[in-house]
Every structure is written in C-alpha cells, then in structure tokens.
Amino acid sequence: MFAQLCTAALLAFGLTGAPRRQGIVGFYDPTTLGGSWLDNAGDGLGEPLNVVISGLSSPQVLTDTGLLNYAEAIGFANECFDIHLGNPQSANLGDGNGWVNQTVELRQDYGSPDLGTCLESLIGGNHFRVYRQNGALANSGALFLAVSQEEPVTDNHDIIPNGYNLGRDALVQAAVGVTTHNGVSYTTTAETLVGIMPVGSTGVNHGIAVDGNAIFLTVRIN
C-alpha cells in the first residue's frame, strides 16, 4: 500500500516522467517505475533492449502490421513458416503492465521475406524480439527491441561473441535513411542513448558484455 501511495504521489506531481497518455515523448525509461533494460530470458538472466522505436514515429509504424512492413523494408520478416521454437521472453517496461511476453520475433530474411528466415534459422543471422510500452503508467507507445546476432542451428542459436552490440548496429545500419516496401517509403533517423543501461555482462544472457548504449529510432512515413 505504501508503495502504491508513493507512486500515486509521484504521478500527481509529475516526478516519474511517466504521464498516462501517448504522444508526449518518444519513450519512458523503464527503470523509472521498476522496469528493466534487460528482458527475462530465464534463469535470472536477460537480453538487452538495445533499440527503441520512438512512440512519436508515424502511428502506422507502431501497429503490428505496420511494424512488420517496416521490418521487411529493413531486411527482417516473420519466422520460418510462422513457427516459433522455444519459450517466449518477457520484458518489464515500467509502464504498469509488469512482465509481458514478446509481441513478435522477427528474423533476418536474406532478401526473401517468404523464405529467407528459414535460411536464418539454419545458418544464423540477426533477429529481434518486440515489446510495446503501453501501460497506464507510461504509455509512450514506443517499441523496445531486443536485437542480437545468433549462431547457426548447429550451435543451438547461441549468441555470437559481442552479438548484442553487433546485432543492434547491423539493424540500425539497415534502417537509417530512406527505405521502401510494399509501396510505403520510410525515413529513419537514429540517436544513441549513451549509457542508458549498465555496461558489462552482469545479468546478461550467455555472459556476453554490452556497451551500455541503446539506439533510439524515429521512423516517419514519407
């Protein structure tokens, strides 16, 4: 009860940085109200939420179908035959929803949205999980992505050395600038959120260190 009263007071005085409605800021720091920049991958470990798509992006981009079209514009698509192996991961974005399972997982498509993700499942490549910040305490509408570069299936899809930083940077390189898919043209800009999460490997899945940075993308439909 005491914690709830404290939270209510902070909200009333605007001290949490977490208004209740969308369209105010691009995202809210998950840690402000008890969230984390690591998702829950099991065994007390997590993977970094190392890319954020701004809640001030074009609204269509932030929908499930709009995100998929944008993902295909930058080289990702649905999993092979829409089959997901393994348990979903969850994230707490500090929005009052607690730990929520990933919305979707998308994989590098190697130039073919229909079959390329099957190749990624075999030989490895880039992929990301999506979490939406939309709870009543911090409803930015932003999409938090856990991006990583993984090994082939013969290595159990483990993350490659430095795979969180490398996966993030590869996605951003593909996204920034003008991209087009299905007749929709996007312009994406990027900003580095330096030191937004702890540096190092403490609590990080596979014991792979991260540099502490996330990339903040704003995506506009032209």
Please describe what each predicted stretch is:
Residues M1-Q4, A8, G14-P19:
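Universal eukaryotic N-terminal targeting presequences
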Residues L5-T7, V210-N222:
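Cleavable C-terminal sorting propeptides in eukaryotic secreted/cell-surface proteins
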